[in-house]
Structures are given as C-alpha cells and as structure tokens.
Amino acid sequence: MSQLLTARQAEELHKSMIAYLLSVNLSKSAAALREELADSVHLDDATAKKYEGLLEKKWTSVVRLQKKIMDLESRNAALQQELDSATPTSLSRRNQDPASWLPRAPARHSLQSHRGPVTCVAFHPIFSSLASGSEDTTIKIWDWELGELERTIKGHTRAVLDVDYGGPRGGTLLASCSSDLTIKLWDPSDEYKNIRTLPGHDHSVSAVRFIPSGAAGSPMSGNLLASASRDKTIRIWDVTTGYCVKTIQGHLDWVRDVFPSPDGRFLMSGGDDRVPRLLDASSGETKSTFIGHEHVVECVTIAPAASYPHLAALAGLKKPPPASSSAEFVATGSRDKTIKIWDSRGTLIKTLVGHDNWIRALVFHPGGKYLLSVSDDKTLRCWDLSQECKCVRTVSDAHGHFVSCIRWAPNIINESGLVSGEGGINGQGTPSMNGVSISTTSKKEDTGGGGKIRCVIATGSVDMNVRVFAS
C-alpha cells in the first residue's frame, strides 16, 4: 500500500478504479484488479454507480488546479516585475489609503457567460469567489481575482433575483431566490450542492440576506436568513431546519429589498409602496417609516458605524452616535432617480440628485466616507459624505446597459476572526460568519468593524456582463 494514502483513502481509490474500468466496459481488467487486491474491495452495482465518475472528476479537478496554480504563478511574476520597475507615482497609487479608494474605469475584468440580464452579485466572505445570478435562471461562480468562470449552478426554473453568502459560523452557505417562488441554499464546500429549498412565499422572491450574528440582543447565531417578496411580506428562515420562523407584514405592495444591520438587530426594507421601513428583526415591529420618495423604492441599505461621523455632521449633530449603536442612518434609492439619506427616526437628512434614471443598488464604502450607487443610466457614482454628499466620481458607461447591482468585496479577516465583509451585507462591517483568522490589520486600514479593506467591487447589468473594479 502507498505510504501517501491512509487505508480508507486506498480503498476509495481502488473502488474508483474498478468502477471506472467497469464503466468503460473493461470488465476483464476490473476482474483482474479485484483478483490482485485479493477481493478486499467489495463493490456491488449501487456502489459501482456511485464511484464510476469519481476518478474522472478528481483527474479533471487536478488539471484545473494545476492551471490555476500556473496562472497565479504567472500573475505573481508579472506583479513582481511591475513592482520592481514601479515609479514613485505608481507606487503612491498602490499605497493609496484603502479608506479613500474609489473605483475607476476600466474594469479589471468583464465576466461574460450569462445568457440573460445579470440581476445580482455576491462575494464569498473568505475566498476569491464571486456569485452572480441572472434572468437566464442560472447562478455562476467566478474567481474574481483571475476573472475566470468556475462553475454554473442550475436549479431555479425562473429568473434568479438575488444571491448572498453567509450562514452559521464555520459553515458558509450561498442563498439564492427566484421568480419561481423559492429560496435555495447551496453548499460551497461540497461543489455547491443544493442542500435545501425553502418554499413558502406566494410570489416572486426579490431579495435574500443572511442576518449576521453580532451584539447581544441580536437574533441568534447567524442561522437566520431574511427574504423579501412580491407577496408583500418579509420572511425570516432558520437555514439549519429550513423552517420559516417569522412572517413580517406591513408593506402594502411588492417588497423589493431587505437589508440587515451589522449586528443583526434591525432590518431595512423597501418596495413598491414607496415607504421604506426599519424593522426590529426579532419582533418584526416597525420602528420607523421613511416618507418622501415619489416612486418605487428599488434598494435600501444601512450605514456602517464608520460613516457615523460624516452623517452626524451632515445631520447637524454635535457628536456622532456611539459606534456600538445600530442602524443610526440609512439610505434608500428609488425610481424617482434620487437617493435619500435618513436618520433612524425617519427624518430626511439629504437628497442626492444626479442620476438620470432609476437607482438600482447602493453600497456604503467600508471606510465610511462614501456612498456608491448604480443606475439604469449606465453609470456608477461615488458620493462623498464629508462634502455634503457631493458626487466626486462618475464611472460613465460602467456597463453597456442598465446597471442592476453592486457589491463591495468583504474585508480581509483580522486576528479576532471578525470580517467587515459580507455574510450578508455588502462588505459593510458585518461580524464574520466564519471564525477563520487570515491576516492582521493595520490601524490605517481598519474600518472599525475589524478587518482590512479590500479595494474590489463587482457590478452586474442587463448587458449580461459582470464587471470587477479593483485597485
């Protein structure tokens, strides 16, 4: 027996070899191998069926990994050469404070494979995986560093409307929702196997977000998932059981978006009734309503604590709320072409005007100073909260058609195991769903939620492309 394999691994290999020989009609060779192994491998028809594709799958996986290693080595060599020949100007850009980094054209990667409009994107909280969903009913998993398609996930029967990574500590899941009325959970650690389907909504499911585990008083443990639907409800699910644990009513029409606070205590929602709501995630009670939009509210988001100093000044407060407080400020985007920033009581602080079409998605910069928006006017805009929300950068023609979604890559996890990344909330200071320590963080790059800012965003569009903007 090979000294490299355990007894169990050797047995698995032998079963795979025999099953492969049988699958290609080499029964004599299979029988000879059995004889050589002294009949130590017991393989009935059902077991043979299970193992027959395993050898080929592992072989192609090795080839794929070898290619990825070669690509990474090539890229590493190119980056080293670039670093060796760098000018002071290029070095100053490379050493730019991540808290002030903003995306600029051209995109690092334009990812093409979908056959319908891209509706949603989400970053894995640790690995360089990016999920995108489309009206073509598929989810695609990309390596955003290499710009390569890793796999296509099929399972939904109608348009995929949203995706999100998160879940229990140490067990990251991918959630997706669809016009087929279902939510599906996929396991990234098991080749994105569909582990659960959550039926219950009576119409299209527009948005899904994992509710982070965080401060005391928050919903328990990171097992919870929030969904918003055209059936006018928000539902909260326990992903470990698949049960709906709460149905929240109050909206009068289609609920387009739902977004959890970093500590999981609150949910922000918005939709066709034009009145966004701040909800208590535990009780479902409406804490505040936000009245002022003149058309459908397409997107909502909650400001991270890093934004409090800028938004408090904008609101005329003498000092910002404590960083430990939750959902002190929120932002909403609408088909009325405006973005509105509010305090948690429902008081309008600022209306941002500049887009020429529907606002489709929002994300706060993890550093806290900026708010980014994308729109059906094909642009990505960056608003400086410290300058009265002045638009300080416009990426014109960010896509060739309506821009439907934007996400910020999760922060690099620090020693404490916290990540200001996704796990459900667009890289805006979420406690980690995975207690894995990856790197330390300099004070300059710390966002306050823990973790080093990753200067990477992804956008999706009706042009069927996903684009990655990076420093």
Swiss-Prot record:
<feature type="compositionally biased region" description="Polar residues">
    <location>
        <begin position="83"/>
        <end position="93"/>
    </location>
</feature>
<feature type="repeat" description="WD 5">
    <location>
        <begin position="292"/>
        <end position="352"/>
    </location>
</feature>
<feature type="domain" description="LisH">
    <location>
        <begin position="9"/>
        <end position="41"/>
    </location>
</feature>
<comment type="subunit">
    <text>Self-associates. Interacts with NDL1 and dynein.</text>
</comment>
<dbReference type="InterPro" id="IPR015943">
    <property type="entry name" value="WD40/YVTN_repeat-like_dom_sf"/>
</dbReference>
<comment type="function">
    <text>Positively regulates the activity of the minus-end directed microtubule motor protein dynein. May enhance dynein-mediated microtubule sliding by targeting dynein to the microtubule plus end. Required for nuclear migration during vegetative growth as well as development. Required for retrograde early endosome (EE) transport from the hyphal tip. Required for localization of dynein to the mitotic spindle poles. Recruits additional proteins to the dynein complex at SPBs.</text>
</comment>
<dbReference type="GO" id="GO:0070840">
    <property type="term" value="F:dynein complex binding"/>
</dbReference>
<dbReference type="InterPro" id="IPR036322">
    <property type="entry name" value="WD40_repeat_dom_sf"/>
</dbReference>
<dbReference type="GO" id="GO:0005874">
    <property type="term" value="C:microtubule"/>
</dbReference>
<dbReference type="Pfam" id="PF24951">
    <property type="entry name" value="LisH_PAC1"/>
</dbReference>
<dbReference type="Pfam" id="PF00400">
    <property type="entry name" value="WD40"/>
</dbReference>
<dbReference type="InterPro" id="IPR006594">
    <property type="entry name" value="LisH"/>
</dbReference>
<keyword id="KW-0677">Repeat</keyword>
<keyword id="KW-0175">Coiled coil</keyword>
<keyword id="KW-0498">Mitosis</keyword>
<feature type="repeat" description="WD 3">
    <location>
        <begin position="200"/>
        <end position="247"/>
    </location>
</feature>
<feature type="repeat" description="WD 1">
    <location>
        <begin position="113"/>
        <end position="154"/>
    </location>
</feature>
<keyword id="KW-0853">WD repeat</keyword>
<feature type="repeat" description="WD 7">
    <location>
        <begin position="398"/>
        <end position="428"/>
    </location>
</feature>
<dbReference type="GO" id="GO:0051012">
    <property type="term" value="P:microtubule sliding"/>
</dbReference>
<dbReference type="GO" id="GO:0051301">
    <property type="term" value="P:cell division"/>
</dbReference>
<feature type="repeat" description="WD 6">
    <location>
        <begin position="354"/>
        <end position="393"/>
    </location>
</feature>
<keyword id="KW-0132">Cell division</keyword>
<protein>
    <recommendedName>
        <fullName>Nuclear distribution protein PAC1</fullName>
    </recommendedName>
</protein>
<keyword id="KW-0813">Transport</keyword>
<dbReference type="InterPro" id="IPR017252">
    <property type="entry name" value="Dynein_regulator_LIS1"/>
</dbReference>
<dbReference type="InterPro" id="IPR050349">
    <property type="entry name" value="WD_LIS1/nudF_dynein_reg"/>
</dbReference>
<feature type="repeat" description="WD 2">
    <location>
        <begin position="156"/>
        <end position="196"/>
    </location>
</feature>
<keyword id="KW-0963">Cytoplasm</keyword>
<dbReference type="InterPro" id="IPR001680">
    <property type="entry name" value="WD40_rpt"/>
</dbReference>
<keyword id="KW-0493">Microtubule</keyword>
<keyword id="KW-0206">Cytoskeleton</keyword>
<dbReference type="GO" id="GO:0005737">
    <property type="term" value="C:cytoplasm"/>
</dbReference>
<dbReference type="GO" id="GO:0000922">
    <property type="term" value="C:spindle pole"/>
</dbReference>
<feature type="compositionally biased region" description="Polar residues">
    <location>
        <begin position="428"/>
        <end position="441"/>
    </location>
</feature>
<feature type="repeat" description="WD 8">
    <location>
        <begin position="429"/>
        <end position="467"/>
    </location>
</feature>
<feature type="region of interest" description="Disordered">
    <location>
        <begin position="83"/>
        <end position="108"/>
    </location>
</feature>
<dbReference type="InterPro" id="IPR020472">
    <property type="entry name" value="G-protein_beta_WD-40_rep"/>
</dbReference>
<dbReference type="InterPro" id="IPR019775">
    <property type="entry name" value="WD40_repeat_CS"/>
</dbReference>
<keyword id="KW-0131">Cell cycle</keyword>
<dbReference type="GO" id="GO:0000132">
    <property type="term" value="P:establishment of mitotic spindle orientation"/>
</dbReference>
<feature type="coiled-coil region">
    <location>
        <begin position="60"/>
        <end position="87"/>
    </location>
</feature>
